[in-house]
């Protein structure tokens, strides 16, 4: 099964709030990634999910480190695996089953992310 991770990213120069969360979904030799304002909560309202450039798979491992290019600090706070297939089109809807620290049906559609009961 493919892996996922949620990183707490602080000090990013393009983030006026000072803290956001990067959702990483393993895909081949990299991770498809979205920026979230909060940690997804089961059955909570969907939140904005901003697509980001692919991240390196090293962020799936337990770690905290400075982000290259003086772009802040990131720490992995949740991780696990997922069932399902990421669509080829990066702008297509995503529906996956998460197992691990976060559990449930992850859905990313129309720029919004939600986590619900399976």
Region locations from a protein language model:
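A charge-rich, low-complexity, intrinsically flexible signal that marks solvent-exposed coils, linkers
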Residues: 1-118
């Amino acid at each position: 099964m493919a892996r996922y991770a949620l990183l707490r990213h602080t000090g990013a120069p393009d983030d006026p709030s000072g803290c956001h969360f990067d959702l990483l979904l393993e895909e081949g030799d990299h991770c498809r990634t979205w920026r979230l304002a909060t940690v997804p909560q089961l059955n909570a309202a969907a939140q904005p999910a901003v697509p980001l450039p692919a991240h390196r798979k090293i962020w799936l491992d337990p770690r905290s480190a400075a982000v290259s290019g003086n772009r802040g600090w990131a720490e992995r706070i949740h991780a696990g695996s997922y069932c399902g297939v990421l669509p080829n089109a990066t702008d297509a809807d995503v529906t996956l089953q998460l197992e691990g620290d976060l559990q449930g049906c992850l859905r990313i559609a129309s720029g919004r992310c939600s986590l619900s009961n399976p």
